[in-house]
Amino acid sequence: MNLMLALLTNFTLATLLVIIAFWLPQLNVYSEKTSPYECGFDPMGSARLPFSMKFFLVAITFLLFDLEIALLLPLPWASQTANLNTMLTMALFLIILLAVSLAYEWTQKGLEWTE
C-alpha cells in the first residue's frame, strides 16, 4: 500500500510539474522570446563555422584531467580503510599519476596554443 501511495504521489507531482512547465512560458509571449536569434549567432548565416582543432584538444585534455580529479582523488578516503598508510599511499599514487600525465602532455606540446 505504501509503495502504491509513493508511486501515485510521484506520478502526480511529475505530471503537475510538466503541465506547469508547458503552461507558464505561454503566459507572457514577447518578440524577443519568439525570435530564432540566440546566443549571438545569426540563424540565417553559414552553418560552417571555423573550428580550432587546438582548442578541441585542450578542451578534451581539460575534461580528462577534471574527471580524473573528480572521480579518482576521493577514492582513498572513500575506501573506508582504517590504515592511514594505505590511504596516503593511494592518494600519493593518484597525485603522482596526474602529475606524470600532465608532464607528458606538456612535453608532447599538447598544451601549447601556438599554431
Swiss-Prot record:
Cystine pairings recorded for this chain: none
Domain of life, per lineage: Eukaryota
InterPro entries: NADH_UbQ/plastoQ_OxRdtase_su3, NDAH_ubi_oxred_su3_sf
UniProt KW Membrane keyword: yes
Pfam families tied to this protein: Oxidored_q4 (PF00507)
GO BP: mitochondrial electron transport, NADH to ubiquinone
Signal peptide: none
Known EC number: 7.1.1.2
Keywords: Electron transport, Formylation, Membrane, Mitochondrion, Mitochondrion inner membrane, NAD, Respiratory chain, Translocase, Transmembrane, Transmembrane helix, Transport, Ubiquinone
Keyword Amino-acid biosynthesis: no
GO terms for MF: NADH dehydrogenase (ubiquinone) activity
Cellular component, GO annotation: mitochondrial inner membrane; respiratory chain complex I
Location in or out of the cell: Mitochondrion inner membrane
TM regions (residue ranges): 3-23, 55-75, 84-104
Catalytic activity: a ubiquinone + NADH + 5 H(+)(in) = a ubiquinol + NAD(+) + 4 H(+)(out)
Modified residues (N-formylmethionine): 1
Topological type in the membrane: Multi-pass membrane protein
Primary enzyme class: translocase
Summary of the function given for this chain in its UniProt record: Core subunit of the mitochondrial membrane respiratory chain NADH dehydrogenase (Complex I) which catalyzes electron transfer from NADH through the respiratory chain, using ubiquinone as an electron acceptor. Essential for the catalytic activity of complex I.
UniProt subunit comment: Core subunit of respiratory chain NADH dehydrogenase (Complex I) which is composed of 45 different subunits. Interacts with TMEM186. Interacts with TMEM242.
Family according to the record: Belongs to the complex I subunit 3 family.
Name listed for the protein in its UniProt record: NADH-ubiquinone oxidoreductase chain 3
Species of origin: Bos taurus (Bovine)
